Amino acid sequence: FIESHQLQKLDHELTETSVIQHLMIKDIDVILSVVKSSVKKISANGVPVVNGTPDIMNARIEFDNGCVANLTASRISLNPMHKIRIFQRNSYINVNFEENEAHIFQMASGAEKGKGKMTLKLSEGKEKEVFYIKPELSESNGIREEILSFKESIENNIDND
């Protein structure tokens, strides 16, 4: 399953924009690119706190392949946060967009050796080998890149279907 939290401080200029359009749509794009399955069902709830449109929103997306994504977006948070966590068999991925970092925990199959390997002590004397990976992420500004791409497509008459 996938869990997404996009929490931002109140910005009076953005209260007229839907919290879905402003915050949640980016995470929906990321999740759809990762899951690669058709959407089976969507359930959502929102609460207007500041004005007539929802300021806090929660959506649950169920996919045909059994994956479930739970997304929360808020524009009235005291502590900004933007994280996506992916839980799957034998691995856990945590991407922190605010800090521009990612953490991956992956169960070792036994044959791997190398940096980042840890042993977890479990109950009844059992142990599990786990790899911890912290990939290097490039500094990027997605909105700036989208605007530059849009500008380039106009200037060069490029059709980006």
Per-region residue spans from a language model:
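Short, intrinsically disordered, charge-balanced linker/junction segments flanking boundaries
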Residues: 1, 156-161
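Contiguous beta-strand/loop segments that form the cofactor/metal-binding neighborhood of enzyme cores
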Residues: 25-107, 140-158
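A short glycine-threonine-serine/GTX helix/turn-capping micro-motif
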Residues: 15-21, 132-141
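A contiguous active-site-proximal alpha/beta segment in oxidoreductase catalytic domains
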Residues: 1-14, 20-21, 27
